[in-house]
Amino acid sequence: MAPTMGVDDLLASPQDDRSPTLLEKDLILAAEVGQALLEKNEELASQIMQMESEMEAMQQEKHMVQRRLEVRDLEASQREAELQADISALRAQLEQKHIQGRDRRREESEQLIQLSNHNQKLVEQLAEAVSLEHTLRTELRTLREEMEDTSFSKSISSARLDSLQAENRVLKERCTHMDERLKSTQEDNERLRSERDGLRERAIELQTSLKDKETELEQEHSTVFQLRTVNRTLQQRVQALGEEASLGEATCFPLSLQSEIQQCQAKETILAHSSVLREKEEEIQRLQKELQSRETELEGLREEVKLFRNSPGKPTYKALEEEMILARQERDALNQQLLNTIRHKVALSQEVESWQEDMRLVICQQVQLQQQEKEKENNKERTGFQRGTRTTKSLRLRGEEGRKGFFSALFGGD
């Protein structure tokens, strides 16, 4: 592969004696280099144009920024002028306020002197009021002592009333408790009455069935007795027949056959009666067992009724009614006592209210007298104070008129 050559080599290449292939390669290479240089030149030209457009945009932006800066400078100068004008106006107002403050302090000093004089007079009046208050307190102390004497009896009655109210509350609670207890006992009594009626019916049924069983048992006993007697007679007859058979073996054949037949019939009747007797005895035993169970059940019911009647924890209905009557009588008595106490308390409160009304009237009269005296003194002081303010106002008006005359003369001369 041929080495790369520059532009100078290409220009100097015609002077060399080379082969036409090398010359052709050099020309191709020169064309490629020229093409690359043209592309590079175009790229640089486009970059230059872009930079020029950016430069123009920056110049326009710079121009706009300069214009904004000039506008801001103009606004700042106007704002500064306005602020300077405001500062000068505020300084003038401050100077005016200083002047007004000096005038006000002068007036306040004068008013303070007048108020100190007025305060001195008020101190003297306060001393008089304190002495008057001391006398009123002594009178009030005596009145309080009298009131304590009356309130002592009132407190005793109120304490008694409180105790009676507490007792009444306790009795009411007891009454409600007794009502609840009575209600529960009534419910228990109703339940027990129903149970008792059921037990009575059950006992009556058991007694009737027991009587029926006893009658049946007596009948069975009688039948058993009859069967036993029949059995005994039959056994006696059998024994007699056996004896006759053993003694009369020597008799004729028909007689022995007839006796055997009679003996067999007697044995059959004895066996039938014994089976019937056995059945009757079994039925008697069954009836005796049933009778014994019914007797035990009846005895249990009697024990339950006896326990209910003799139980100390469950009071009877009559005792509960007596206790309720006593509680109601006690409640009525306490209510009557409470009403009497309330009436007595109302009478005492009316007496205390009338006494307090008298005291209030006396105190109001004394306070009105004090207020009238204070109003008289205040009116005197107001008249003196108004005279002083009128003199100061007249002097101030005269000074202002002198100033106006001076300024009018000054401007008129100009």
UniProtKB/Swiss-Prot annotation:
Residues 34-341 form a coiled coil. Residues 372-399 are annotated as: Disordered. One of its GO terms (biological process) is Golgi to secretory granule transport. Residues 372-384 have a biased composition (Basic and acidic residues). GO terms for cellular component: cytoplasm. The keyword Hydrolase does not apply. The keyword Glycosyltransferase does not apply. Keywords: Coiled coil. This is BICD family-like cargo adapter 2. It comes from Danio rerio. The gene is bicdl2.
